């Protein structure tokens, strides 16, 4: 979708000072502002409050109009803390939605929801800006090619492959490894594909945001010597921000990604961590605006808000945005309205399992719950499809036999079932993999495994060629050759102990 970027320097100096309102009421992050008759701002217009607090410190708060109340009043949601604001303060209507800087100048930098740099590296060239509220590309502009996006992570590439220009969800409860998986994907994609990424930190921990920034500087994804050579732009609206900022920070990140797609005609990666916090912030704002809550206390506009964000993430004939979104699952309940609404938009789902994490199998991706629309013979080829189906069948049979094993033990199984269980346990361990970004914690060097190597490895396990190897040889290795080498080392160690 082509849109001419606006070329103007942002700031209040260029604002029409005539359209002034006054704060009539402040309730937390929500402001009611009275304007002169006939001078009402439009929905989504940015309002700016400038002044000084009671101690004389300067205040500069940007708000977004959400409701027109009548009696020449509007209700707006603040994008930053409202501390120090008082009734009667002047409010300037900017006459336009929030606009953020876009283009090459954003690479290697960290921004807040307003597009202001927060990394203490000086101002950003904001001669080119885009409004954060934009319509999705027209149907005729969409690109419908189907191709696989290789990640180098075995369990993902084999069982739930990602679509280039598609939307992928990482589902998991607290502490099962969503953010680590996202960091690994950024690392692998920057190294293997050299693509540009935009990372939207929506309502997550500030510490994780800082860790990610440091990690990117160490791995060279952000080039400290020459910032312009960096491969990623970061947009943060963390847990401590007001709900307005957390609700809009995803749109800011998406707007920056859209510029790379539409104007630079690039393939972009958009990471959102965490899309649930976008819904949560929308729920808080909805309650503050006095809307009647719907199921489980969520906002009545949940599907609309999610749709307006997700429909902008797509491939056009100019370029593509491949989006990988972490989805926190409240109380591990996938039927909760927030994850359930997200499911409808996704091409692939990577479900993280607490059971696998407890066994120490990382990435803790559930091979049976994770799905992908790309796993079809006409897209991935017969060999890949057959291998993936056999792996799933073996693991499913193992899952069915677990109750019998728990009650009666392995000895009561038939010879065929015992062989299935042995192979399934090897497959389960071979689906684990050492990550580059976790090297500092695990001490094992990270591994990138190509798709052909992955398929070959699982075919060897399924064929029975490796039935004689111990299952621990398959744990936390890269390709199958490393597993056989590890088995030889284990055998030598056990012989030397004897």
UniProtKB/Swiss-Prot annotation:
PANTHER family: ATP SYNTHASE, ATP SYNTHASE SUBUNIT BETA, CHLOROPLASTIC. It is an enzyme of class 7 (translocase). SUPFAM superfamilies: C-terminal domain of alpha and beta subunits of F1 ATP synthase, N-terminal domain of alpha and beta subunits of F1 ATP synthase, P-loop containing nucleoside triphosphate hydrolases. Transmembrane segments: none annotated. It is found in: Plastid, Chloroplast thylakoid membrane. F-type ATPases have 2 components, CF(1) - the catalytic core - and CF(0) - the membrane proton channel. CF(1) has five subunits: alpha(3), beta(3), gamma(1), delta(1), epsilon(1). CF(0) has four main subunits: a(1), b(1), b'(1) and c(9-12). This is ATP synthase subunit beta, chloroplastic. Belongs to the ATPase alpha/beta chains family.
